[in-house]
Amino acid sequence: MTNGDSDYTPIDKEEYIMATWKNLDTLSSYDKLSGLKNHVDIATAMSGEQGGERVKNYSTPMAAGLQYNYAAKEVDETVLTALAELADEAQLIDKFEELYNGAVINTGEKRMVLHHLARTQLGNPVVVDGVDKREFYVAQQKKAADFANKVHAGEIVNEAGEKFTTVVQIGIGGSDLGPRALYIALENWAKANNTFKMEAKFISNVDPDDAAAVLASVDLAHALFIVVSKSGTTLETLTNEAFVKDALTKAGLNPSKHMLAVTSETSPLAKSDEYLTAIFMDDYIGGRYSS
């Protein structure tokens, strides 16, 4: 988002922004909302029978049978009305429409924001340099799923022809946070529903003791490593990758038979033959959404 409060000048005649981008604290409805701080005593609101009724009322249905429940948040009808007024003044709906239609929403870096296209097509096709981005993301998702299914089925195996049992991700920042959060959130559910496939570990700390501890906890011969770096030049990630490659080599293993890359099509990793495969992402999806 832009840090200023002036209208954004588009970088391309076909990429335009109709909404006005201003900091929230310049909006009158923001001042009204700020004045409602501590308006709701959540401990009282959630107690007794009124708490149960609140849980029923402050819930919104989502896809796949999920419910978003915000009963434990410090809101009531007054606060919700103030939030709606802020959304209107900030042109939230207009900006959301511009986002899914491919406008330059990340005005600081002059980029579109397209992580939503990894899930579905909400608006008009978004085409960049002749490439339909929805089709591109779906193709990469299919490539990743096909690779994972082959690993699970024992079609992609280690040098001894044995199945991989552990996957270790090497990344930093959002590229670590997103996959780690998903794994933590879904691990127990997958085990309870008999869909758990492989144990996952994560290396993100550049302290070699951290990487060494992770490697000591896995059987290297049966471990598959995913190197995640959009640019392919992230120093911390490449440092940890080198550490892992050294450990694999010392164990008598060929690192190229144990590694795959998640990167951009233009990165050095994409052109390397040191990986089993490469899954591509681009500059329009941030690291934490790349999982």
What residues fall within each predicted segment?
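Polar/charged alpha-helical tracts
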Residues: 15-17, 44, 216, 249
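Short, Lys/Arg-enriched N-terminal segments with co-localized hydrophobic residues
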Residues: 1-17
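Generic N-terminal initiation segments characterized by hydrophobic and/or small/turn-forming residues
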Residues: 8, 15, 111-114, 266
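Short, intrinsically disordered, charge-balanced linker/junction segments flanking boundaries
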Residues: 13-18, 46, 287-291
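Extended, charge-enriched "interface" segments that sit outside catalytic cores
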Residues: 21-160
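Tryptophan-centered motif/residue detector
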Residues: 3-4, 115, 247, 286
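Glycine-rich phosphate-binding loops that contact phosphosugars or nucleotide phosphates
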Residues: 146-154, 161-291
